[in-house]
């Protein structure tokens, strides 16, 4: 499927529009990510300025840009399986954003799979912006591993009780039609980009999720991350 059609490219009807943009970056922080984690951090730090430039090139203005990070590992292995930041407003809080990223180190996780799906659930339940005439709610995910099925770690002492128990429940959250989970997230504004391996559940989500784009990698880990491609995909799509 054409990537811009999949994301919803409706041409130039929204030129000269102002957008409030929230981006949540779900980052695999397990030991196997050590060779690529610095590149992921570099992508995160440069993303806001590149995104503004890309939006300006399509005659769209970013009024407010916020970013949040969720670093995930494995509930059965790690004492801190999920590390979440607040939303940072950029560029004003660039220093705090960088400080949070600097504290993320590739460690733990054991063998795959990892608890990446829980990070998506946390992202969807975040305090997304609901101000402004036009909004984008963007999730970027970076992992070199398959995912633990939702709910499989429920027996772990530190596993939360307020998360979806299946891909179907997560999909309902993504589409904004969940009966059990509510947040400021708006499906119309939602965009997902995943740099993921060609494994469960990413192949399943690729077939079923709308407004989502997946860059599949081989089994040896993530390939180089093309930040320009991410920006191009997002700025060519409209709410």
What are these regions, as identified by a protein language model?
Residues 1-24, 30-39:
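Acidic, polar low-complexity linker/tail segments
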Residues 4-18, 56-61, 123-137, 182-186:
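Surface-exposed acidic, glycine-flexible loop patches that form ligand/cofactor-binding
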Residues 15-16, 210-239:
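C-terminal "exit" segments of structured domains
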Residues 20-21, 31-66:
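…and closely analogous acidic/polar surface helices at protein-protein or active-site interfaces
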Residues 27-28, 40, 69, 120, ...:
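DG-centered beta-turn motif at the end of beta-strands
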Residues 29-33, 74-77, 109, 144-149, ...:
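Solvent-exposed loop/turn segments at secondary-structure junctions
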Residues 77-79, 85-138, 147-148:
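Von Willebrand factor
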Residues 145-208:
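VWA/integrin I-like adhesion module and closely mimicked acidic/polar interface patches used
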């Amino acid at each position: 499927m054409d990537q811009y059609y999949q994301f919803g490219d409706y041409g130039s009807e929204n030129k000269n529009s102002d957008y409030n943009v929230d981006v949540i970056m779900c980052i695999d922080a397990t030991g196997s990510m050590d060779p690529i984690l610095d590149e992921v951090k570099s992508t995160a730090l440069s993303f806001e300025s590149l995104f503004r430039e890309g939006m300006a090139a399509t005659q769209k203005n970013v009024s407010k840009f916020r970013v949040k990070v969720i670093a995930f590992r494995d509930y059965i292995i790690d004492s801190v399986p999920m590390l979440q930041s607040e939303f940072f407003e950029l560029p004003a809080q660039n220093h705090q954003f960088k400080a949070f990223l600097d504290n993320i180190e590739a460690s733990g996780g054991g063998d795959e799979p990892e608890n990446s799906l829980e990070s998506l659930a946390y992202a969807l339940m975040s305090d997304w912006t609901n101000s402004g005439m036009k909004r984008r709610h963007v999730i970027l995910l970076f992992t070199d591993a398959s995912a633990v099925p939702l709910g499989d770690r429920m027996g772990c002492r530190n596993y939360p009780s307020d998360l979806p128990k299946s891909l179907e429940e997560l999909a309902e959250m993504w589409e904004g039609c969940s009966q059990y989970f509510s947040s400021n997230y708006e499906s119309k504004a939602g965009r997902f980009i995943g740099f993921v391996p060609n494994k469960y559940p990413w192949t399943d989500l690729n077939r079923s999720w709308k407004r989502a784009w997946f860059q599949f990698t081989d089994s040896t880990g993530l390939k180089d991350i093309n930040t320009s491609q991410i920006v191009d995909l997002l700025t060519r799509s409209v709410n």
